[in-house]
Amino acid sequence: MQFKRVTFMLIVILFAVQTAGARDYDRQLLRRVMNYAEPYLSDFPDSLVSNTYLKGHIKILRRNFTLAAIPTMFYLLRDGKREFFFESYSKQIFHDRKNVKTIQNILISTIYHRHKTLNNVVEYLSPQLYQTQLFKNGILSPVRNSNRKYYRYKTEMINDSLAIITFKSKLQNTQLLRNGLLNVNRITGRIISFQFEGEYDMVRFSVSGKMGEKGIQTLYPSNCHIFSSIKSFGNHLHATFDAYYNLPITLPDTIQNSEDRELMNSLRPIKLNMTELAIMAEYDSINSKSKNTLAKTKKKRKGIKYFLWNILGENMLHKIHVSTVDKRGKIRINPLLNPLYLGYNHRRGLTYKFDLRGGYDLTNNSNFSGRVKLGYAFRESKLFYTFTSRYNFNKRRNGYVELEFSNGNRIVDSRVLDEVKRVDNIDSINWDAMNLDYFKDLKSKVAFNYDIINKRLGMKSGFIIHRRSAVDKEGFKRAGRTSNYKSFAPFISVSWYPLTNDYPLVFTSQYEHAMKIFGGNFRYDKMEFDGQYIHHLPCLRSLSLRGGLGFYLDKRGETQFLDYSNFKENYIPHGWYDDWSGEFELLNPNWYNASDFYMRFNLTYESPLLLLTWMPYFGRIIEKERLYASSLGIQKLSPYTEIGYGFTTRVFSMGIFTGFSPKHFEGFGIKLGLELFENW
């Protein structure tokens, strides 16, 4: 009996030791794989160049008219076809592992006007396995040690030099891969090949590929394949893409957007399959017939069909990208009519926004740029605009001259300050009963900026002109009061970047002095100080901090307008990635002009896996969540506090806020923004 007990104990101990040893070895192997890139990342070259071949096959299984509203999908409706193919050969230059410049040498496409499509899916062909984010827009990489807590791993030893690591996400969320496997070298930890599945931004995908074999190329795929399924508004598409990197032949930069098929045949690393050849043959047949009937159809091109496809489609429902012949100038215009640019704010109601950008490179260190931002608030029936033009004469030292013209919110004069001072209890404030005088505000700004200490200390100077006119001019005339006011104020601003402007930490101070010259009606001195910092945490988390104060030193004139640069209402709410953090969502807009000083503090915590993420089903579609906390001190309202919670999904973003002061509760408010196809 004693012998049996001893034998049993030895077996248990031996099994435990073997199990522990195997588990430790699994950890060691996983650690070796995750740390493999460190020697290369610490000595990363300034740039990497890759000759890349890309091909794609798109098949429409089900479609309806809403397909036209999906970015780059409009042209798939043009010819009534259901299958499309394109291939390209290009030179890609990778800078700092993030910025990629692409020179497209050859493009062959059966899509209308030789377009490419689904660029957001094409990005999945370049997974950054060793980065926190697998792709540019998201998804936590299972090879990053900081993301390890979100995945379960298993290891299978194939032989003395090879092993397979399988992984699966611990919860279903769009920021995590569902499952996958890695073929790795047991000795070095190098990933030989990979395979994984996931779903992000309405794209369900399966990716497989092989990694490079030597040096820093082992951090990147040498070839990659993706199969994706896209379902949206009743439309269903399948898209297959293949990419081959580091090909030996480099074409001269003078060859761009060529349609030379013979040249492509000599460069293509793999043969086209039967389906792809059939699509090309059908496309050539249709083109041949079109050329034969060109004379007959030329007159018909001015009809309604031509207008819908070429005028309405290209300019109203589709993003417009225009380049000059020398490729130095570019114009980018968002769709003129697109319901996806609608937003909602509890105070302004429904809003619509529009954005146009353009630029021209003079040299590598100088350029012209311009931007037009428009927004329409339906509840107020008001159009807001900002026109900005800039001449960058020294980009390396952030040297530029900028002109800006804009109209903002209706503003009240300093009489509101006098009214507020008479009130003893904030609960008794009735803004409507004050009969405040409202003014339209037109703003012009000229600024000169230059980094005195490169990337650390910048100085901006210029002047600001405000032209304010009364909304009710007849009432001013009857009262014998001036209905138009103008201010001319030179300013100087200093920005300090303690860690250089490559890091999100900046302190800014600005002094503004209004003078009674050039038609100015009054004088004032104003100071503002502002500090902003974003602390990036592991796993796509971040903590944003902002604090500031402002005050008027001197005010002289018939009337005054208390108007701050860093404490004002954003009159057109944008999406998740704009100014959701650092704003006061429930504060009555009259308070922005009712105090001759302010102190503010804003804190925002962002994480892809926070609260709702852990809820069944709903947590699957949550991309990121935020917690907000803001505090404000102004005349008669100190302290005022807002707290809120927000989240964004593939379709929309939403924020819920509440605000209160020691003697008053502001209630609750919501903010909505459409994020559909934001990353497409």
PLM segments and residue spans:
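Structured extracytoplasmic
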Residues: 22-162, 169-176, 239-344, 435, ...
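Gly/Pro-enriched, hydrophobic low-complexity segments
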Residues: 155, 160-259
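Transmembrane beta-strand segments that form the barrel wall of outer-membrane beta-barrel proteins
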Residues: 191-198, 226, 332-344, 355, ...
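Short loop/turn motifs that connect adjacent beta-strands in outer-membrane beta-barrel proteins
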Residues: 320-333, 346, 361-369, 394-401, ...
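Outer-membrane beta-barrel transmembrane strands
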Residues: 346-348, 358, 431-465, 499, ...
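Residues that define the transmembrane beta-barrel architecture of outer-membrane proteins
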Residues: 348-352, 381-385, 440-444, 482-490, ...
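Residues on the lipid-exposed face of transmembrane beta-strands in outer-membrane beta-barrel proteins
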Residues: 352-358, 387-391, 446-452, 463, ...
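C-terminal outer-membrane beta-barrel translocator/porin domains of Gram-negative envelope proteins
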Residues: 400-418, 428-434, 501-502, 506-609
